[in-house]
Amino acid sequence: MADDAIPHTDVLNSTAQGQLKSIIERVERLEVEKAEIMEQIKEVYAEAKGNGFDVKVLKKVVRIRKQDRAKRQEEDAILDLYLSAIGEI
């Protein structure tokens, strides 16, 4: 069975190997950038908290602003319906 194994260097030609290496390196660089951005976001939320803002609510506002307006309105209407049905509003 080992005789039938393809040596790893023969699996991809040199062009494909170069492309694969380039892709992997780009992803790795982006992962580093993502970590740096996440740290910056964390610092902004810490600053907001220091200024007396509720970070949990701020995160919710950011999440809501990302949503499509029509989809958000539909979800809000369904939420209101469900809350009304159980006597919460």
From Swiss-Prot:
Transmembrane segments: none annotated. Belongs to the UPF0335 family. Pfam families: GapR_DNA-bd. This is UPF0335 protein CC_3319. GO terms for molecular function: DNA binding. InterPro entries: GapR-like (IPR018753), GapR-like_DNA-bd (IPR046367).
